[in-house]
A protein has these predicted regions:
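A mid-sequence, solvent-exposed acidic-amphipathic segment
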Residues: 132-160, 165-170
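FMN-binding flavodoxin-like domain, especially the glycine-rich phosphate-binding loop
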Residues: 1-8, 12-148, 177
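Iron-sulfur cluster-binding cysteine motifs and their immediate structural context
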Residues: 162-180, 186
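Generic detector of bulky aromatic hydrophobic side chains
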Residues: 28, 150-153, 185
Length: 186
């Protein structure tokens, strides 16, 4: 079963896992944080002590506090975190950053991690990994990708009588995430 955390139409508070389930919870890191809609929606799910594997994907800049924030959010929702991975992928906005990632070496490393996680699950090892990040988390902010005018900018008005409206979507409005429960009894 797959649950799309970007789908605001899902009644997340009605979702409940079983203790012998394994959930793979994957989110992007935007500005070193988990997108707020993912935090809100994951928080509404009843994890019921299901084991959780966390994956935070970032665009080759830094994962910063996103993985530890995901851990805290998952644990507060009742999940039991047993593994965590930060994975590099092509940047979601500037596609030239980390182009070609994950590459063959990344895939090999991820495959090795998957093998280690499978062994841990098979052994019913519920130890919590040490996950990097800071508490309190860094402040949320507007993406550095948005231009910030300063004294060197010049306003040029070509059509002063026309009203122009631009829709600026924040990174939090562009995310896609999923959580996939897997059956692995312990």
């Amino acid at each position: 079963t797959a649950i799309d955390l970007s789908d605001g139409q899902i009644p997340f508070s009605t979702l409940s896992l079983q203790e012998d389930d394994v959930a793979v919870i994957a989110v992007p890191s935007y500005g070193g944080r988990v997108p707020q809609p993912a935090v809100d929606r994951l928080s509404a799910i009843n994890g019921n002590h299901a084991r959780a594997i966390l994956i935070c994907v970032y665009g080759n800049r830094a994962v910063e506090d996103a993985l530890v924030e995901l851990q805290d959010t998952a644990e507060a929702a009742g999940f039991h975190v047993v593994a965590a991975i930060s994975a590099i992928a092509r940047h979601s906005i500037v596609h030239e950053i980390a182009a070609g990632r994950p590459d063959a070496q990344d895939q090999k490393t991820l495959s090795e991690f998957a093998g280690q996680i499978k062994k841990k699950l098979d052994a019913c090892d519920r130890s919590v990994p040490s996950i990097p990040g800071s508490r309190p988390y860094k402040n949320r902010g507007v993406s550095a990708m948005l231009p910030k005018p300063d004294q060197h900018w010049t306003l040029i008005s070509v059509f002063p009588a026309c009203a122009v409206s631009l829709s600026v979507r924040t990174p939090q409005e562009r995310q896609t995430k999923s959580i996939s429960p897997l059956s692995a009894p312990c």
